[in-house]
Amino acid sequence: MPIRIPDTLPARETLLKEGVAVMTETDAVRQDIRPLQIALLNLMPNKIRTETQIARLIGASPLQVELTLVRVGGHTPKNTSQEHLISFYQTWEEIRERKFDGFIITGAPIEQMPFEEVNYWEELTQIFDWTQTNVHSPFYICWGAMAAAYHFHGLPKYQLEAKAFGVFRHRNLDLASPYLSGFSDDFAIPVSRWTEVRRADVLERQSLRLLIDSDDTGPCLLEDRARRSLYMFNHVEYDSFSLKEEFERDREAGKQIQVPFGYYPGDDPARQPLNRWRSHAHLLFGNWINQTYQSTPFSLDEIGQ
């Protein structure tokens, strides 16, 4: 089944060109089945880019999914037009009475700030708590994962001396995990962050299970079984050119930035980067969608009961 998104969402044209099945609202009504209700709290500056990346992965599922785009109300994005926000996004206050099968919270380029200094931290902690009663399975990404792990588990983040930036090898630590079904033993995932969580801190917390790890960049994916939550500290959702654009942006701004590790053939920025993580990105999101579908109540009203 395809993903259901607004007919005029900019991501729609991109997804159709890539062969992703996209459903009109008329077609969705005609099928007369309950789609999975998935919401995306998009904290990234380039919201159109991020919503396209997430919709691409969710839309590959054989299940019908309806995607709701959400933003925090206490922050006005500078890189996305008000017209786009008004047309396609709702604030959390506007959807807080609803229930969702899945809820994705993205990263944000504020990882070097203490959590409590983020101008929408209070609202975000309310959203975290709300997911425990109104969401069946939350999925946190990068800074969103660090923030949620700190909020729920007291897991600290640490400043890195240099940015972890590139495509790094990772290990599958749990072949039996349904979230890692089909994963190789060893695979590549993009990383782009100035902070880290540490393996020793994760292992001290019995409520967390380490599923994916890297010798180079540390813990990547955690599971909280009791809360049916996933914490992804890296950027498996990135498309082929995300790291390239970040590198060129920082270089043009005169910032100290190294060539992303393991990304360009021969570490030559003049060459076309190779996407070596696409299949595992689809596997992870597909497995999450499937697990959510298998365990969520048929009636949304029963979520949280």
Swiss-Prot record:
Site, as annotated: Important for acyl-CoA specificity: E111
Record GO terms (molecular function): homoserine O-acetyltransferase activity; homoserine O-succinyltransferase activity
GO terms for biological process, alphabetical: L-methionine biosynthetic process from homoserine via O-succinyl-L-homoserine and cystathionine
Keywords of this entry: Acyltransferase, Amino-acid biosynthesis, Cytoplasm, Methionine biosynthesis, Transferase
Keyword flag NAD: no
Annotated site residue numbers, Important for substrate specificity: S192
Compartmental location: Cytoplasm
Keyword Acyltransferase listed: yes
Matching Gene3D superfamilies: 3.40.50.880
Functional pathway: Amino-acid biosynthesis; L-methionine biosynthesis via de novo pathway; O-acetyl-L-homoserine from L-homoserine: step 1/1
Record's catalysed reaction(s): L-homoserine + acetyl-CoA = O-acetyl-L-homoserine + CoA
GO cellular component, one term: cytoplasm
Active-site residues, record numbering mapped to chain: C142, H235, E237
Positions annotated to bind substrate: K163, S192, R249
Pfam short name (any one): HTS
Entries under SUPFAM superfamilies matching the protein: Class I glutamine amidotransferase-like
Superkingdom, natural source: Bacteria
E.C. designation(s): 2.3.1.31
UniProt similarity note: Belongs to the MetA family.
Cited function: Transfers an acetyl group from acetyl-CoA to L-homoserine, forming acetyl-L-homoserine.
Name by which UniProt lists this protein: Homoserine O-acetyltransferase
